[in-house]
């Protein structure tokens, strides 16, 4: 009940922030569909509500909501508003998510792509806050807060998961800080620019967290374009933890190497590199909406930093099709196929992976 009240309070607060300065608003509802190995086919809807202010017509606050249900009986509800405060040069991003998400467990530090799988169903409520203070020349400071409640309602094999951290019901409470640089020309389909983010988070018992650990992430992206229709994209991602983290919050190599399931390789730390060539070779009203991508992903999950070894990196290569819903800012439907030896995966979704 408290969780529902929290979301309701956020919604009412967001309405009150409009005040008398509201100038224009936009509202839209879109159906969604996608496919991945983790979910099978899924469908849902997403609603967008944007409203601007008289004094700052170029800035819009967001009230967005998403609901999805999958072929594997997974449910996700997400409310993610964004509020701009131009006088103080800041913005606040909130994210309240509920998930009832039947999943697969292959063990922690697994190295076998053919490892035996065990099913379990967690129910997770998470509330995140990202307060961003904009500095000069595309730099920004961030303050983060993360609150999580998780309980596993079903287990296929309770004995296997008995001693795994995060097997029981738990609360996580953490705060963090970061700095970012962003010169991208678009977030939906970037054709040029740089993005860099360094983030440090701490989950502490004095904040009410059942687990004490620290997490450091580094996300670097570069985009180089021959022209708007031919783009090379690169990403370097690093994630390290100290202390004990619930298994569901570990580094998932499959989120970055597209030939593998997300949950197949769980590790305390991880590093990944991705490269893509995205191109739209055709012209005409229909042709200009059809594009393609070639990609290469590689990375490694490891227990300790000293275990980093290029020989242990897992790789995938693949290709994809892009269909532009909007041609001005290139919001694309994405159909990707990645493969590595006997492992392969299909991913159908909206927007680019990075």
Feature-to-residue mapping (PLM):
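Hydrophobic h-region of N-terminal signal peptides that target proteins for export
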Residues: 10-18
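Gram-negative/organellar outer-membrane beta-barrel architecture
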Residues: 21-29, 33-171, 330-334, 338-345, ...
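Membrane-embedded beta-strand positions of outer-membrane beta-barrel proteins
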Residues: 29-33, 63-67, 92-96, 141-145, ...
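Extracellular loop and loop/strand-boundary signature of outer-membrane beta-barrel proteins
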Residues: 65-66, 111-117, 160-166, 203-208, ...
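Transmembrane beta-barrel architecture of outer-membrane proteins
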Residues: 75-77, 98-100, 121-127, 147-151, ...
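C-terminal outer-membrane beta-barrel translocator/porin domains of Gram-negative envelope proteins
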Residues: 78, 175-180, 184-290, 294
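C-terminal hydrophobic structural anchor segments
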Residues: 278-316
């Amino acid at each position: 009940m408290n969780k529902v009240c929290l979301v309701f309070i956020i919604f009412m607060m967001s309405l009150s922030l409009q005040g008398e300065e509201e100038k224009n608003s936009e509202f839209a509802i879109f159906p969604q569909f996608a496919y991945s190995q983790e979910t099978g086919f899924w469908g849902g809807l997403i609603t967008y509500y944007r409203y601007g202010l008289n004094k700052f017509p170029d800035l819009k606050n967001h009230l967005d909501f998403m609901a999805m249900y999958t072929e594997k009986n997974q449910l996700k509800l997400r409310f993610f508003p964004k509020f701009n405060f131009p006088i103080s040069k800041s913005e606040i991003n909130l994210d309240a998510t509920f998930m009832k998400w039947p999943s697969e467990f292959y063990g922690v530090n697994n190295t076998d792509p053919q490892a035996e799988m065990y099913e379990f169903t967690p129910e997770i409520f998470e509330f995140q806050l990202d307060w961003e203070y904009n500095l000069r020349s595309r730099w920004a400071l961030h303050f983060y807060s993360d609150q999580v409640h998780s309980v596993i309602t079903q287990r296929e094999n309770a004995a296997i998961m008995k001693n795994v951290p995060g097997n029981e019901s738990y609360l996580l409470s953490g705060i963090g800080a970061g700095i970012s640089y962003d010169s991208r020309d678009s977030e939906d389909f970037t054709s040029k620019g740089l993005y860099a983010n360094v983030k440090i988070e701490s989950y502490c018992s004095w904040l009410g967290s059942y687990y004490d650990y620290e997490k450091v992430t580094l996300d670097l992206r570069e985009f180089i374009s021959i022209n708007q229709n031919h783009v090379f994209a690169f990403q370097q991602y690093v994630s390290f933890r100290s202390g004990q983290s619930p298994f569901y919050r570990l580094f998932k190599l499959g989120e970055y190497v597209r030939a593998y399931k997300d949950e197949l390789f769980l590790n305390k730390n991880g590093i990944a590199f991705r490269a893509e060539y995205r191109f739209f070779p055709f012209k005409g009203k229909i042709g200009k909406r059809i594009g393609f991508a070639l990609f290469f992903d590689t990375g490694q999950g490891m227990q300790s930093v000293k275990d980093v070894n290029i020989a242990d990196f897992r790789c995938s290569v693949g290709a994809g099709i892009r269909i532009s819903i909007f041609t001005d800012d290139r919001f694309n439907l994405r159909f990707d196929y990645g493969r590595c030896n006997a492992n392969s995966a299909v991913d159908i979704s909206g927007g680019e992976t990075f």
